[in-house]
Every structure is written in structure tokens, then in C-alpha cells.
């Protein structure tokens, strides 16, 4: 029985290795990177990778489950730490790639005005609606938003009125479709969606630094290293900047 289990484990590992070697490079990236990273991939002079976009928590769980990923770009340090602590990253390949800002958004036709500050009447501004957030317990954008609202003393007002989404782009879509009157997303998400407008910007001191770390996943090939290096060069960084991301190096 033990021998059979050992053989099965070997076959599974060989299957993952074969998937890495035979198919295109697979990149897992935070959903908020979609537009910018798609453009970066088009500019890449090598073999173009396949990029999967989702919440960083979802990606981290899939990597933990053995997904044949070469490069992981998260939207916060926590999920990268999670994988590092469990030995899923190649030592020495982790870098902080980009920064971002957190904003409160509404539909363009909305006349709602709300100054972001301690004790702001956020619940009143929502009326009968809900506040769209990426899941505040485990998705980076939602965690940043919860931290900011707690620091402002208004989380208790709205915690039972959250329209929770699996990632920040899904939260953005709730506002764009008019299903939620307000949402908290990244500045770069607004740049990618004409059907929302910024009501206010959260001061960076209200939440942990919004950082997108990048690392190579254990078992990644040399082509993963080449693409990761391209993400940090001038051409790629200029594309990210054009989409509203901040340079960190």
C-alpha cells in the first residue's frame, strides 16, 4: 500500500513537471493587474506566457495544491508570506514589483459626495444599498479596505452591509452595473472601468502599504526567470505606470 502511494505521488509530480515543460509558462496574477499585465505580456519579446487572474488568496491555495505555476504576482505581502513560509517559492526570487492606491467609487451618474475622514457617514451614504468590497477577510483589496474603515471608525457601521466579491474586479463590476451604490477598489481599477467615478481617496496611512510582490514558484523553469526579469525592466514598468501603478524601484 505504501509503495503504491509512493508511486502515485511520483506520477503526480511527473505530471506537474511535464505540464510545466510542455505547455506555455503559466503566471498567476492578482485580478487588479489584468489590463496592465495583458499589455506587458504583448510587449514581451520572448514566448508569451498564459496569465490567470484571480484573487491572491485563490491563487495561493491553488499553488499550495500543486498548480504548475512559474510566476506568482500577489496584491499583498501576506499571501506571498504564506507561500514562502510553506516552502512554495524559490529563495531569492521575491521582489516588490508595484504599488497602488485605495479609492471609494460610485457610478458616474451618482451625485453622491462624501469626504473621507474619521466618522464619515458611510452607512447613511449607502442608503438601502451595500458597500462592494473584495472579501475583507482574505482578499487583499478587501483587507486594505477593512483596515482603512476600522482606522476611520466606521467599520462597525457597515460590516453587515458588505456586498462581498471574490476579487477586486468583481467588486468593481458590482458598482459599474449599479448593483451597489459604493465600492472600495484600487485607483488602477477605476482607470480600467469608465462606468465608475472616484468619490474619494484613502490616505495611505490608513492601511498597510499596497504592494504587489512577485516570486518564482518552486519547480519553475528558466523561462519563468526571464519573464520575471522583464516585469522589472524599464519597458514593463512604464506600461504599469501608464495604467496608474506606482514604481517601487
Predicted regions and their residues:
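Sec/Tat signal peptide C-region and signal peptidase I cleavage site
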Residues: 17-21
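Exported/periplasmic ABC-transporter solute-binding proteins
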Residues: 22-67, 72-77, 81-249
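Bacterial N-terminal signal peptides
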Residues: 4-15
Amino acid at each position: 500500500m505504501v509503495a503504491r502511494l509512493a508511486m502515485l505521488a511520483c506520477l503526480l509530480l511527473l505530471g506537474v513537471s511535464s505540464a510545466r515543460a510542455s505547455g506555455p509558462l503559466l503566471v498567476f496574477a492578482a485580478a487588479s493587474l489584468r489590463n496592465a499585465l495583458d499589455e506587458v505580456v504583448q510587449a514581451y519579446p520572448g514566448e508569451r506566457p498564459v496569465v490567470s487572474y484571480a484573487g491572491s488568496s485563490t491563487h495561493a491555495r491553488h499553488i499550495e495544491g500543486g498548480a504548475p505555476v512559474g510566476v506568482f504576482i500577489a496584491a499583498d505581502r501576506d499571501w506571498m508570506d504564506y507561500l514562502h513560509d510553506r516552502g512554495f517559492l524559490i529563495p531569492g526570487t521575491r521582489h516588490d514589483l508595484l504599488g497602488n492606491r485605495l479609492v471609494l467609487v460610485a457610478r458616474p451618474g451618482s451625485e453622491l459626495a462624501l469626504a473621507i475622514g474619521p466618522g464619515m457617514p458611510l452607512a447613511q451614504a449607502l442608503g438601502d444599498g451595500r458597500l462592494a468590497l473584495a472579501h475583507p477577510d482574505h482578499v487583499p483589496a478587501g483587507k486594505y479596505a477593512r483596515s482603512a474603515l476600522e482606522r476611520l471608525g466606521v467599520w462597525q457601521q457597515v460590516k453587515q452591509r458588505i456586498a462581498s466579491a471574490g476579487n477586486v474586479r468583481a467588486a468593481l463590476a458590482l458598482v459599474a452595473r449599479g448593483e451597489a451604490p459604493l465600492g472600495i477598489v484600487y485607483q488602477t481599477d477605476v482607470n480600467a472601468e469608465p462606468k465608475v467615478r472616484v468619490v474619494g481617496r484613502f490616505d495611505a496611512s490608513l492601511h498597510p502599504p499596497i504592494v504587489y510582490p512577485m516570486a518564482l514558484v518552486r519547480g519553475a523553469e528558466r523561462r519563468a526567470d526571464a519573464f520575471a526579469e522583464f516585469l522589472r525592466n524599464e519597458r514593463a514598468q512604464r506600461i504599469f505606470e501608464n495604467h496608474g501603478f506606482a514604481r517601487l524601484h
